[in-house]
Amino acid sequence: MPMATTIDGTDYTNIMPITVFTTVYLGVFIGIDTSTTGFTCFSRY
């Protein structure tokens, strides 16, 4: 899975990618739609 995540148009690939990924993952896990929290360009697998 690609770790590149774009938030608000800023590339966070090298800025704490694990924290960003975990935040997105937990958001999806508990049922929060990432499209409403400002996360974009995130591929769900």
From Swiss-Prot:
Name of the protein in its database record: Non-structural protein of 4.8 kDa
Family: Belongs to the coronaviruses ns4/ns4.8 protein family.
Top-level taxon of origin: Viruses
Pfam families: Corona_NS4
